[in-house]
């Protein structure tokens, strides 16, 4: 909308509680009210979801796409565009905090006193398992108390529904938790990605320690429980509240490698710049698509030799205001192994079940070499309570021996388990 933005002033947090802020807010509210009145009288099926004041003066509405131009032409409307949708940045491999934090020097920073004490990080993600033991310990010198959050709710300056402090304040570790996607305070029902990210940032238990174990975490759920993407409208609402609440940093492990239309991207870039101007460190994932050929139809994830391509970086991490954070593979990983004498041999269990049967063996077994696992390879061999050691590939009766057939033959011969090697 056409009008001044509160974030144009020097200190956003201080300004928001001043008399000047109240005066500006009334002017901004009148501008939004005029536009809302026109939306209601000139268009059908329009619902206002959010009103923004801090990072920009505007509205988020649900309307028919056919009415976009009509909305753009309304008096007082500077621009209107369709909300962009971002996807999660999924990890390329499983990581363990015990190894990943030291891999980036997090343990060194903690030893020098940088533990996140007195700091608050807003995590815009899929939510959090609030009962997880990694977030149960009390915070040393928390920045926000329960009363602080209650005061913010009472000021009616947040973009949350009709909630009370009892439902939104989880603990001094998690002083704020809200689901912007579903407009409620249940942040525990989504993908575990958010809990994983929150653990990296601020886990603090006897088992795992994050980069900033003494930091408070504001959990701002912006993804649906079904894995659907995060909309700009919800993201901006969460960013507004992060500014109003006074977060020191914002973490967003989301992005879109291909980017968006120039008009929408320009407006979003301005919003992120104002968040930075408010003194907040804005950290966004660079993404894991090292090339625009990643997950392409070619099936190799590699570019053509005739078109070698360049690395691809996800938006919004490409905005000037954001610190683009690239991923790195963990230098260590835990893996199951078989112990043969003093030698540890890694293995992979391809079973698609939550409980791996091989783990239930828990004993010492003799192994017997059984060729490629054809029926004839078991002739004359005693396999009761023993493990069949079978080579990959091979044929039987002119047919290629599948893993399933090898296992079937071994079971018929009385084997306790099967190990297939290449």
Give, region by region, the residue ranges found by the protein language model.
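Subtilisin-like serine protease catalytic core
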Residues: 108-231, 245-248, 276-277, 292-294, ...
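Glycine-rich, histidine-containing beta strand-loop boundary motifs that form or position
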Residues: 63, 72, 81-84, 121-123, ...
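Inhibitory N-terminal propeptides of secreted protease zymogens
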Residues: 1-90
């Amino acid at each position: 909308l056409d009008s001044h933005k509160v974030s144009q002033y020097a200190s956003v947090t201080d300004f928001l509680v001043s008399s000047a802020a109240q005066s500006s807010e009334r002017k901004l509210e009148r501008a939004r009210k005029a536009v809302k009145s026109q939306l209601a009288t000139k268009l059908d099926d329009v619902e206002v979801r959010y009103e923004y004041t801090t990072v920009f003066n505007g509205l988020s509405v649900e309307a028919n796409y056919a009415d976009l131009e009509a909305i753009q032409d309304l008096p007082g409307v500077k621009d209107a565009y369709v909300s962009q949708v971002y996807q999660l940045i999924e990890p390329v491999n499983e990581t363990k905090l015990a190894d990943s934090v030291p891999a980036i020097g997090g343990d060194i920073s903690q030893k020098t006193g940088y533990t996140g004490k007195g700091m608050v990080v807003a995590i815009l993600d899929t939510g959090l398992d609030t009962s997880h033991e990694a977030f149960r310990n009390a915070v040393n010198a928390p920045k926000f108390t329960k009363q602080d959050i209650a005061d913010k709710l009472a000021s009616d300056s947040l973009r949350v529904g009709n909630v009370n402090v009892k439902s939104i304040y989880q603990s001094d570790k998690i002083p704020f938790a809200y689901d912007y996607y579903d407009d409620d305070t249940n942040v525990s029902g989504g993908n575990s990605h958010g809990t994983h990210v929150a653990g990296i940032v601020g886990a603090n238990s006897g088992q795992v320690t994050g980069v900033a174990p003494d930091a408070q975490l504001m959990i701002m759920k912006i993804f649906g429980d079904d894995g659907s993407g995060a909309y700009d409208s919800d993201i901006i609402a969460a960013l507004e509240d992060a500014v109003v609440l006074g977060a020191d940093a914002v973490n967003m492990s989301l992005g879109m490698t291909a980017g968006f239309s120039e008009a929408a991207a320009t407006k979003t870039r301005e919003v992120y710049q104002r968040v930075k101007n408010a003194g907040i460190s804005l950290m966004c994932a660079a993404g894991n698509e090292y090339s625009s050929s990643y997950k392409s139809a070619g099936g190799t994830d590699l570019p053509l030799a005739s078109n070698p391509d360049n690395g691809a970086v996800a938006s919004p991490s490409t905005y000037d205001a954001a610190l683009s954070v690239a991923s790195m593979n963990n230098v260590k990983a835990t893996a199951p192994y078989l112990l043969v004498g003093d030698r540890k041999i890694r293995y992979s269990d391809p079973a698609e079940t939550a409980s791996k049967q091989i783990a239930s063996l828990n004993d010492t077994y003799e192994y017997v070499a059984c060729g490629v696992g054809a029926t004839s390879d078991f002739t004359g061999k005693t396999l009761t309570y023993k493990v069949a050691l079978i080579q990959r590939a091979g044929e039987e009766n002119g047919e290629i021996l599948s893993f399933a057939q090898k296992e079937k033959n071994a079971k018929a011969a009385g084997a306790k388990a099967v190990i297939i090697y290449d």
